């Protein structure tokens, strides 16, 4: 009988293990060799929109913003909705699209244009019909970049809080937030957040806690995910502090679930000692937390090494309670994964 114990335990563990309900490539036959920085939003129950940038290579002038709609259980062919052509004829790359569906009003697509992250500026377009058609591009006010990688959130009073950051310049990597109460017509800059000891952070992702506090988790080039907290609805933020979670200098994203748990998608790997600012973007994992402090690994999405890894996740919970994730797959494709959070247990 003893010889049956281990196989039975393995079988039971396999039965309990969470598995994605859907795992598929969105842009299987893309007309460009490289893509990155996906974002996803639910525009109506059962209707999703995803966006990313694609072109010959990140930073090249031909890199544009592509959008795909998901209806009737399948992804439509992606279309090019924004480029970096300027009135004077110059053409710059586009970067880091971020979709945001407000409680009311059109779908918003924020993105960046410019020769490099240290020199880019914020842009936005809107769609009144769930991503089918788009407005002409609009430049954000000087100094306003919009959400830099991760989704904006709606505060209880209806204001949009955009998690943002800057790279380069005299301030280096700094996290800040941008607030608008009139759908992007006027803006308030909050921050930058105090850097804390030995932490260079960008690309925050905002979480809501039951006690009313807000939390942001941030990418760093210091080997760990950083965190900052707000006790007053996002108007002021604590100095950045290191978490116990590793970060190989790669984007993360997180979402507060309807049941109050916090869900994080991240690369569970630290940079090697001889390359402290750059690590492997593999594996790609999911963790859960009740308090935003103690995190528990619950699922590995990708673990097979590949040249360019799996990175820059975007995660939402849709009206049906499911978790939807999109992310870069080896810089060649955008992958879409669906999870049932009820199956995710430490």
Where are these regions (language model features)?
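Asp-box/BNR beta-propeller blade signature and adjacent active/binding-site loops
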Residues: 16-346
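Sec-dependent N-terminal signal peptides
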Residues: 3-14
């Amino acid at each position: 009988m003893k010889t049956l114990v281990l196989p039975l335990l393995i079988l039971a563990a396999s039965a309990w293990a969470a598995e994605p309900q859907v795992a598929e490539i969105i842009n299987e036959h893309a007309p460009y060799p490289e893509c990155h920085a996906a974002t996803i939003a639910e525009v109506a129950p059962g209707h999703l929109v995803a966006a990313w940038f694609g072109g010959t290579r990140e930073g090249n002038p031909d890199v544009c913003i592509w959008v795909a709609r998901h209806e009737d259980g399948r992804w439509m062919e992606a279309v090019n909705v924004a480029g970096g052509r300027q009135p004077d004829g110059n053409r710059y790359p586009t970067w880091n699209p971020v979709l945001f569906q407000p409680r009311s009003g059109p779908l918003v697509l924020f993105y960046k244009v410019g020769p490099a992250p240290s020199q880019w500026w914020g842009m936005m377009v809107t769609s009144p019909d769930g991503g089918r058609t788009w407005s002409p591009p609009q430049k954000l006010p000087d100094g306003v970049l919009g959400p830099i990688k991760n989704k904006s959130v709606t505060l209880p009073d209806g204001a949009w809080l955009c998690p943002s950051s800057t790279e380069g310049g005299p301030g280096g990597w700094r996290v800040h937030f941008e607030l608008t109460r009139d759908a992007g017509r006027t803006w308030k800059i909050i921050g930058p957040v105090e850097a804390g000891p030995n932490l260079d952070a960008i690309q925050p992702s905002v979480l809501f806690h039951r006690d009313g506090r807000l939390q942001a988790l941030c990418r760093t080039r210091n080997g760990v995910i950083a965190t900052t907290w707000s006790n007053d609805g996002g108007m002021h933020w604590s100095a950045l502090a290191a978490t116990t979670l590793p970060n190989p200098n790669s984007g993360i994203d997180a979402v507060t679930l309807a049941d109050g748990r916090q869900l994080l998608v991240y690369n569970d790997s630290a940079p090697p000692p001889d390359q402290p600012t750059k690590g492997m973007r593999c594996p790609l994992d999911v963790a859960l937390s009740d308090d935003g402090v103690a995190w528990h690994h619950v699922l590995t999405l990708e673990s097979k090494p590949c040249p360019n890894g799996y990175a820059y996740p975007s995660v939402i919970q849709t009206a049906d309670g499911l978790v939807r994730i999109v992310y870069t797959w080896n810089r060649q494709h955008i992958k879409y994964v669906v999870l049932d959070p009820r199956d995710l247990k430490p």
